[in-house]
Amino acid sequence: MYIKLSNLFQRLQNLAKRSRTATKPRSLILLILLFVLSLSIPLVAHQVSALSIIVQTQQNPLQLVEQAKKLYTTGQFEQAALVWQKTAEGFAAQGDNLNQAMALSNLSLTQQQLGKWAEAKQAIATSLKLLEIQEKTPTQRLIQAQTLDIQGQLQLAVGRSQIALKTWQQAADIYKNIGNKHKFIQSQINQAQAMQELGLYRRACEILLESLELEHQDLDISKQQLQTLTEKFSGTGDLASLQVLGLRSLGDVLRVIGNSEQSQLILAESVKLAKQFGDSQNLAAGYFSLGNTVLSLGNQKAQIETISTPITFTSSPDCMARANNTVSELYQQAAACYHQAELSTDANINAKAKLNLLSLLIETQQWSEISTLLPKIQSQLDKLPMSHGAIYAQINLAQNLICLKSAVNPEVSQLSSPLLQQCGVSQEKTTNTGGNTLQPTLIPAWEDIAKIVTTARNQAQVLQDNQAQAYALGYLGGVYQEIGEIPNAQRFTQEALQLVSAFDAPHIAYRWQWQLGRLRRIQENQQGAIAAYTAAVETLKSLRKDLTVINPDIQYTFRDSVAPVYREFVDLLLQANNSNQTNLKQARDAIEALQLAELDDYFRDACIEAKPQQIDRVVDKATPAAAVLYTITLPDRLELILKLPGQENLEHYTTTVTQAQLKDNLTQLIERLNDKTRFAGEIQELSQQTYDWLIKPAQSKLVDSKVKTLVFVLDGLLRNIPMAVLYDRASQEYLVQKYALVITPGLQLISPRPLANVRLNAMLAGMSEQRSFPDENQLFSNLKFVPNELGKIQKQVPNNEKLLDQYFLKATLQEHLANAKYTIVHLATHGEFNSDPEKTFIATWDHLIKIKDLDKLLRSGKTNQPISIELLVLSACKTATGDSRATLGLAGVAVRAGARSTLASLWSVNDESTSELMGEFYSELVNANGRKNVSKAEALQQAQLALLNNRDRNKKWERPYYWAPFVLVGNWL
C-alpha cells in the first residue's frame, strides 16, 4: 500500500519516541517513494513507474533520507549519491541490514542517473545480498521485489534486455505472491519495456493489455473499452501515473505492430490524463510517442498519395491527426508533437524528440529549421549519461546526418551502404526544389559521422553492451564504404557479424550480411556476395514473426529495409555470368520468399500458417497441362523464370525494360481499363507491349509444352493488371483466349485438389440496396442485379443458403458459417482492396468487415479451425485507385480467409454483366463437377470468353472493362 509521506513522518516520530523508552531497540519502517525512472530505449521515450522502498531509521537518518530525496527530485544527483552513501553507512553501523539494503538500492538508482554503471551495479548487488539473509516476511519480500525493479532498470540501461526481463518477471512473481496488485501491474509494464527492446512487440502488447485489464482479440482495442478503462481509473491518484504510463507503452507497441490509428487514440488519452494529473514528465513523453504515431500515419499516406507540391511547414497545428489530413498536415502535426516534447526537462526525452524532429525535417527538406535545430542536438546528447539509450541516440544522429547528406546530394548507387537505403523514402516524399539554403558548414563530412559512430562504439565497449557495439561496428562499416575505404568497411562489417553471432539478434545480423554482400559485389567477389546475400535472406526468414524488430528506432519501411535484399539477391543470381539451374532455383525461392514477406509486412504478422505444397509437384501432375511464370522487376530489366510441366530444369528470360518504362505502361493501362468508355483498341495499344515483355519470350516453349493453364507469380505493379487482357498482336488474341489464368502469391497452395472431387454447398450473401456508413465515410450505390446473380447461382448449386440485404448481417453470416461447412462462400457486395489492411473491407448490411476480421468470421464456432472453403467469391470489389500495394489486399484476403481459391474483381463493374459472368462461371463449375477435366481456372476462362464474344452493341460487354477484372487467386484445379 502507499502511505502519504506527511502522515508517515508524524507516525515515525511517534514511534521513535516510544522506541527510546523500550528495553530493546525495535526495527522501524519508513516508506520512501522512489522516483519515476527513464528507460533509455532507442527513439522511444519509455518510463518505469514509480517505485517505493522501505527504510527504517531513527531521527537523524530520517533527516538524511529526506535530504537525499529532495536532492534527487531536484536533479542534484551527485549530492544525492553522497547522502545515500552516508545513510547506508549509518544503517550498517547500527547493524540494520534491512534499511542498509534500502539505502543502497536508492544509491544505485541515483548512480544510474549519473551513468556510473559499475558503482550502481555494486550497490544493487550488495543490497540484494543483504536482503537474502533477512527473514522472509511480507515486508522483506516487498523490499526485495522493489530492489529487483531497480536492478532491472540498471540491466536494461546497459543493454542487458533479456536479463532485465527475467529480473522483472521475478519481481512480478513476488508482487503476485504477496497480493500487491498495483506493483504487479507496474512490473508488467516494466516487462513490456524489455520485450520491446528485444523486438517482442506482440508479447509486449499482450502483457500491456493484460495489465490494463483490457479484453482483446488479435491485439485490437475498441473505443468503448478505452472509455471504460478511463472511467475505471478516473480520479484514482495512486494509479494515475501508472495508468498514463501503461497507456503510452501500449500506444507505442500498437504503432510498431501496424495499428497506428489505435495507437493514436490510446496515446491521445495518455496525454489527456497526464495533463489532468499535472504529470509534466509523462506529458512530454506522451507528446513524443504521439509524434511518432502521427509521423507513421503520414508515412503510410505518403506511400499511396502523389505529392505534387513541396511540403512546407506554414502553421503550428495541434498534434492530433484526423482522417482527412493530408500528408503535409500530418507531418506538421508530428513536428508540433515533437516541439511539445522538447519542452521536457528530462534530457532523454528532449534529445529523442530533437532527433526525431530532425529526421522529419530532413525528409521534408525544411532547410532553415534544420539549420536551427542541428547545432542544438549534439550539445543535448552531451548531457546524456553513458547508457544503452545514449549510444543509440548517437547512432540515430549518425543516421540522420547520413540522410542529410543523401538529401543534399541524392545520388545513391545500388552498391552504396544499406544505411543510405534507409533514406530512400525521403526523396519520393518531397519535391521541395526551392533551393538548398542549408549552410555548407552544417553538411557533415563522412569523417565527422565516423567520429560520432566511433564514440558510440567506444561507449558500448565500456558498458560491455555487445548489441550496441555490433550495431555501431556495422555503421562504421557503412560509413567507410561511403568514404571509399572498402577494406576498412569490410573489416568493421565482419567484426560486427562476428560479434552478433555470439547472441541472438537477427534484426542486426541481416543488415550487416546485406552490407557485406554489397561490399563483395564492389570487389567483384560474386560467390562471396551470393553467400552473404543467402545468409541475409535466411536471417530474414527467421524474422517472419516480427519484421518490425528490424529497425524500431528509425522509421521502418519494408520497401527500404527488406525488399531490396531480395531484389538485389535475385539480380545477382540472374546476371549473365551467374545464371545456372542452381542459381535459377535459388532465385525462384527468393522471389517466393519476397512474396511471403510482403504479405507478412502487409498484416504486420506471419499470416500464412498452412502447410504449403510445392507448386512444381502440382504443375507436373496437373491435367490439363499448366506452367508457372515468376516475375521480378529490377531497376534495368524484368526477369522471368518459367516452370514447365514435367521438366525439372527452369527456363530463364530477361526483358530489357527500365522500371520507369514499365511503370508508365502499367499506370496508363490501369487507367484505361478502369474507364468503361475505352474501346478495345485503346486497351490493346498498351497491353500488347506488356504481352511482349512478359509472354512473348516464353511463347514458343508454352506452345511446345501444350500448356493450357498459366499460373503467375507477379511482382509490384504487375499485380494490378489482369493478365487476361494482355494482347498478342500477331494472333490478335487476348491471353485469356489462349490460356486459363490464375495468380498465386508464391509457391504456397492450401491442400490443392480438383473441385470435381468436392460436393458443392454454397453460402450466398449480397447487398442490392444503397447503404451508407457515415462513421467510415462510405456510401455504397445499389447493386440491383445482385438478386439475379444469386438466383442464377442457386439454380446451379441447389444446396445453398442465402442472405440478402437486411438479412445479410455480420452476426447472421457468422452464425451460418459456424454451424455449417460450406465449400463455396459467395459475397455479392461492395468491398475494397487497399494497401492499408484497416481500409480493406467487405461490406455487410450492418458492418464493414475488415480483412483482419475475415478469417475470424470464416472459422467454425467450437473448434476455431479454418473451414475448408474451396472457393471464396467477392464479385463486386474494387482496388484502391493509384495504390501500387492495393492488390496485396486481394492476396491477403485469399490467404487470410483460408480458402483454397479466391475469385474477385479488381474494379467495380456493371452488376448486370457481373451477374451474367457469374452465371456462366457456376454453370461451368457444375459441369466440372461431372467432368474431371474442367478446372476452376477454365471455368473462369469460359465465363470471360462468354462476355468477350457477346456482340450485343447495346451492352458492349466485349470491352475489357466488363470481363477482364475478374482474377482467380490460389488453387486453379
Please report, for each region that a protein language model flagged, where it lies by residue.
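An often Trp-containing, charged/polar helix-loop segment at the C-terminal end
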Residues: 24, 343, 914-973
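N-terminal leader/linker segments that initiate helical-solenoid repeat arrays
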Residues: 37-106, 142
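TPR/TPR-like alpha-solenoid signature
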Residues: 58, 65, 85, 98, ...
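Residue signature of alpha-solenoid helical repeat architecture, marking inter-repeat boundaries
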Residues: 58-59, 78, 98, 142, ...
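Alpha-helical solenoid repeat scaffolds used for protein-protein interaction
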Residues: 201, 205, 209, 213-225, ...
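Catalytic-core domains of enzymes
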Residues: 621-622, 717-824, 839-844
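Catalytic cores of nucleophile-dependent amide-cleaving enzymes
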Residues: 743-747, 752, 823-920
